[in-house]
Regions:
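Glycine-enriched, solvent-exposed interface loops adjoining structured elements
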Residues: 1-235
Protein backbone atom coordinates (compact mmCIF):
# COMPACT_ATOMS: atom_id res chain seq x y z
CA UNK A 1 0.00 0.00 0.00
CA UNK A 2 1.51 3.33 -1.04
CA UNK A 3 1.43 6.57 0.94
CA UNK A 4 -1.48 8.07 -1.02
CA UNK A 5 -3.62 4.98 -0.45
CA UNK A 6 -2.84 5.06 3.27
CA UNK A 7 -3.84 8.73 3.46
CA UNK A 8 -7.06 7.94 1.59
CA UNK A 9 -7.89 5.25 4.15
CA UNK A 10 -7.27 7.78 6.92
CA UNK A 11 -9.67 10.15 5.15
CA UNK A 12 -12.33 7.44 5.15
CA UNK A 13 -11.78 6.76 8.86
CA UNK A 14 -12.00 10.44 9.77
CA UNK A 15 -14.97 11.09 7.45
CA UNK A 16 -13.20 13.69 5.38
CA UNK A 17 -12.54 14.21 1.69
CA UNK A 18 -10.00 11.84 0.18
CA UNK A 19 -6.72 13.40 -1.01
CA UNK A 20 -6.09 12.87 -4.72
CA UNK A 21 -2.51 14.15 -5.13
CA UNK A 22 -0.30 14.77 -2.11
CA UNK A 23 2.24 16.69 -4.20
CA UNK A 24 -0.08 18.94 -6.18
CA UNK A 25 0.52 21.87 -3.86
CA UNK A 26 -2.69 23.64 -4.91
CA UNK A 27 -5.11 22.05 -2.45
CA UNK A 28 -4.51 22.80 1.23
CA UNK A 29 -6.42 19.66 2.17
CA UNK A 30 -3.96 17.44 0.30
CA UNK A 31 -0.99 19.45 1.58
CA UNK A 32 -2.04 18.81 5.18
CA UNK A 33 -2.10 15.08 4.55
CA UNK A 34 1.39 15.30 3.03
CA UNK A 35 2.66 17.26 6.02
CA UNK A 36 1.36 14.82 8.64
CA UNK A 37 2.53 11.82 6.59
CA UNK A 38 6.07 13.21 6.45
CA UNK A 39 5.99 13.98 10.17
CA UNK A 40 4.83 10.45 10.98
CA UNK A 41 7.47 8.69 8.86
CA UNK A 42 10.23 10.91 10.22
CA UNK A 43 9.09 10.22 13.79
CA UNK A 44 9.04 6.46 13.20
CA UNK A 45 12.56 6.51 11.78
CA UNK A 46 13.81 8.28 14.91
CA UNK A 47 11.84 6.07 17.30
CA UNK A 48 14.49 3.39 17.69
CA UNK A 49 16.72 0.80 16.06
CA UNK A 50 14.17 -0.84 13.79
CA UNK A 51 15.39 -4.12 12.34
CA UNK A 52 14.16 -3.00 8.90
CA UNK A 53 16.52 -0.01 9.10
CA UNK A 54 19.54 -1.90 10.43
CA UNK A 55 22.33 -2.24 7.87
CA UNK A 56 25.99 -3.19 7.80
CA UNK A 57 28.80 -1.06 6.42
CA UNK A 58 32.55 -1.47 5.98
CA UNK A 59 35.20 1.19 6.57
CA UNK A 60 38.66 0.60 5.05
CA UNK A 61 41.22 2.48 7.11
CA UNK A 62 43.99 4.59 5.58
CA UNK A 63 47.40 4.95 7.20
CA UNK A 64 47.71 8.03 9.45
CA UNK A 65 44.08 9.00 8.84
CA UNK A 66 41.83 9.59 11.87
CA UNK A 67 38.75 11.31 10.38
CA UNK A 68 36.31 9.57 8.01
CA UNK A 69 33.21 11.50 6.79
CA UNK A 70 30.23 9.21 7.24
CA UNK A 71 28.56 10.32 4.00
CA UNK A 72 31.54 8.86 2.13
CA UNK A 73 30.91 5.49 3.75
CA UNK A 74 27.11 5.26 3.97
CA UNK A 75 25.02 8.07 2.41
CA UNK A 76 21.87 6.88 4.22
CA UNK A 77 23.45 6.99 7.70
CA UNK A 78 21.34 8.12 10.67
CA UNK A 79 23.09 6.64 13.71
CA UNK A 80 25.57 3.93 14.58
CA UNK A 81 24.50 0.92 16.62
CA UNK A 82 26.85 0.84 19.56
CA UNK A 83 28.70 -2.37 20.39
CA UNK A 84 28.40 -3.60 16.79
CA UNK A 85 31.80 -2.43 15.53
CA UNK A 86 34.44 -5.06 14.74
CA UNK A 87 37.66 -5.37 12.80
CA UNK A 88 36.84 -7.89 10.09
CA UNK A 89 38.70 -11.21 10.19
CA UNK A 90 40.16 -10.23 13.55
CA UNK A 91 39.34 -11.00 17.17
CA UNK A 92 39.93 -7.38 18.16
CA UNK A 93 36.82 -5.37 18.90
CA UNK A 94 36.57 -1.65 18.37
CA UNK A 95 35.15 0.03 21.46
CA UNK A 96 31.89 1.84 20.76
CA UNK A 97 31.43 5.58 20.44
CA UNK A 98 32.72 7.22 23.63
CA UNK A 99 31.58 10.33 25.48
CA UNK A 100 33.45 13.65 25.22
CA UNK A 101 34.73 13.12 28.78
CA UNK A 102 36.04 9.64 27.92
CA UNK A 103 37.60 11.04 24.75
CA UNK A 104 39.66 13.62 26.66
CA UNK A 105 40.58 11.14 29.39
CA UNK A 106 41.77 8.54 26.88
CA UNK A 107 43.59 11.11 24.77
CA UNK A 108 45.58 12.79 27.50
CA UNK A 109 45.65 10.57 30.58
CA UNK A 110 45.32 6.92 29.58
CA UNK A 111 48.01 4.47 28.63
CA UNK A 112 47.71 3.05 25.10
CA UNK A 113 46.06 -0.35 24.79
CA UNK A 114 44.95 -2.76 22.09
CA UNK A 115 41.52 -1.23 21.60
CA UNK A 116 40.64 1.26 18.90
CA UNK A 117 38.41 4.05 20.14
CA UNK A 118 36.35 6.55 18.20
CA UNK A 119 33.63 9.17 18.48
CA UNK A 120 30.95 10.44 16.13
CA UNK A 121 31.29 14.19 15.61
CA UNK A 122 30.44 16.57 12.79
CA UNK A 123 28.94 13.69 10.77
CA UNK A 124 32.29 11.90 10.80
CA UNK A 125 33.92 8.95 12.55
CA UNK A 126 36.97 10.25 14.43
CA UNK A 127 39.48 7.78 15.85
CA UNK A 128 41.40 8.65 18.99
CA UNK A 129 44.53 7.38 17.27
CA UNK A 130 44.93 6.48 13.60
CA UNK A 131 44.44 2.72 13.11
CA UNK A 132 46.79 0.79 10.87
CA UNK A 133 46.08 1.22 7.18
CA UNK A 134 44.13 -1.46 5.35
CA UNK A 135 41.98 -2.58 8.27
CA UNK A 136 38.38 -3.39 7.38
CA UNK A 137 36.14 -2.17 10.16
CA UNK A 138 32.55 -3.34 9.91
CA UNK A 139 29.66 -1.84 11.84
CA UNK A 140 25.90 -1.77 11.93
CA UNK A 141 23.99 1.47 11.62
CA UNK A 142 20.46 2.76 11.41
CA UNK A 143 19.48 3.98 7.95
CA UNK A 144 17.60 7.26 7.52
CA UNK A 145 15.26 5.69 4.96
CA UNK A 146 11.52 6.00 5.56
CA UNK A 147 10.11 4.66 2.28
CA UNK A 148 11.01 3.10 -1.04
CA UNK A 149 10.07 3.92 -4.61
CA UNK A 150 7.10 1.84 -5.72
CA UNK A 151 8.67 1.23 -9.13
CA UNK A 152 12.44 1.03 -8.62
CA UNK A 153 12.31 -0.09 -4.96
CA UNK A 154 15.04 2.43 -4.17
CA UNK A 155 15.04 3.42 -0.50
CA UNK A 156 14.48 7.12 0.19
CA UNK A 157 14.84 9.43 3.23
CA UNK A 158 11.53 11.17 2.49
CA UNK A 159 8.42 10.67 0.39
CA UNK A 160 8.43 12.45 -2.98
CA UNK A 161 5.73 10.58 -4.90
CA UNK A 162 2.17 9.40 -4.28
CA UNK A 163 3.34 5.87 -5.09
CA UNK A 164 6.13 5.76 -2.50
CA UNK A 165 5.70 2.88 -0.05
CA UNK A 166 6.53 3.29 3.66
CA UNK A 167 9.16 0.94 5.07
CA UNK A 168 7.31 0.67 8.37
CA UNK A 169 4.23 -1.37 9.22
CA UNK A 170 1.36 0.10 7.22
CA UNK A 171 -1.14 -0.13 10.07
CA UNK A 172 1.16 1.78 12.41
CA UNK A 173 1.67 4.44 9.73
CA UNK A 174 -2.09 4.70 9.24
CA UNK A 175 -2.72 5.11 12.96
CA UNK A 176 0.04 7.71 13.20
CA UNK A 177 -1.28 9.78 10.32
CA UNK A 178 -4.80 9.53 11.76
CA UNK A 179 -4.03 11.04 15.17
CA UNK A 180 -1.73 13.65 13.65
CA UNK A 181 -4.40 14.69 11.15
CA UNK A 182 -7.00 14.99 13.91
CA UNK A 183 -4.62 17.07 16.02
CA UNK A 184 -3.72 19.29 13.06
CA UNK A 185 -7.40 20.01 12.50
CA UNK A 186 -8.15 20.80 16.15
CA UNK A 187 -10.08 17.60 16.88
CA UNK A 188 -9.82 15.24 19.84
CA UNK A 189 -7.25 12.54 19.13
CA UNK A 190 -6.79 10.92 22.55
CA UNK A 191 -8.26 7.53 21.66
CA UNK A 192 -6.45 7.34 18.32
CA UNK A 193 -3.15 8.37 19.89
CA UNK A 194 -3.40 5.74 22.64
CA UNK A 195 -4.16 3.03 20.08
CA UNK A 196 -1.20 4.20 18.01
CA UNK A 197 1.20 4.12 20.97
CA UNK A 198 0.11 0.61 21.93
CA UNK A 199 0.50 -0.73 18.39
CA UNK A 200 3.83 1.06 17.93
CA UNK A 201 5.32 -0.47 21.08
CA UNK A 202 4.04 -3.88 20.02
CA UNK A 203 5.58 -3.73 16.54
CA UNK A 204 8.88 -2.31 17.78
CA UNK A 205 9.09 -4.91 20.54
CA UNK A 206 8.53 -7.71 18.03
CA UNK A 207 11.53 -6.48 16.05
CA UNK A 208 13.72 -6.44 19.15
CA UNK A 209 12.73 -9.99 20.01
CA UNK A 210 13.88 -11.29 16.62
CA UNK A 211 17.28 -9.57 16.38
CA UNK A 212 20.07 -11.69 14.97
CA UNK A 213 22.70 -13.25 17.20
CA UNK A 214 26.19 -12.84 15.72
CA UNK A 215 27.90 -16.24 15.64
CA UNK A 216 30.84 -15.11 13.52
CA UNK A 217 33.04 -13.81 16.35
CA UNK A 218 35.24 -15.89 18.59
CA UNK A 219 33.45 -15.10 21.83
CA UNK A 220 29.87 -14.06 22.46
CA UNK A 221 28.54 -12.67 25.69
CA UNK A 222 25.00 -14.03 25.52
CA UNK A 223 24.00 -12.12 28.62
CA UNK A 224 24.84 -8.87 26.83
CA UNK A 225 22.86 -10.00 23.78
CA UNK A 226 19.73 -10.35 25.88
CA UNK A 227 19.62 -14.11 25.28
CA UNK A 228 20.70 -16.53 28.03
CA UNK A 229 21.28 -20.17 27.15
CA UNK A 230 21.60 -22.86 29.80
CA UNK A 231 24.77 -24.75 28.86
CA UNK A 232 23.46 -27.97 30.41
CA UNK A 233 20.09 -28.03 28.69
CA UNK A 234 20.81 -25.93 25.62
CA UNK A 235 17.67 -23.88 26.32
Amino acid sequence: MNILEICQEVADITSTQRPTDLFNGKLQHDSIFLSVAKAELSSLMRYGDWQDLTKEATLLTVKNKTVYPIDNIVPDFYSILNNTVYIKDDMEKVIGAITPEDWMREKYFSCPDANIKFKIQGNAIKFLEAPEGGKRIVFQYRSNAVCYDGTTFEEKPTITKNTDIPIFDKYVVQLGITWRWLKRNGMDYTEEYNEYEEELRKKFGTGLATKDINLAVGEIDLADSGVIIDVKTGK
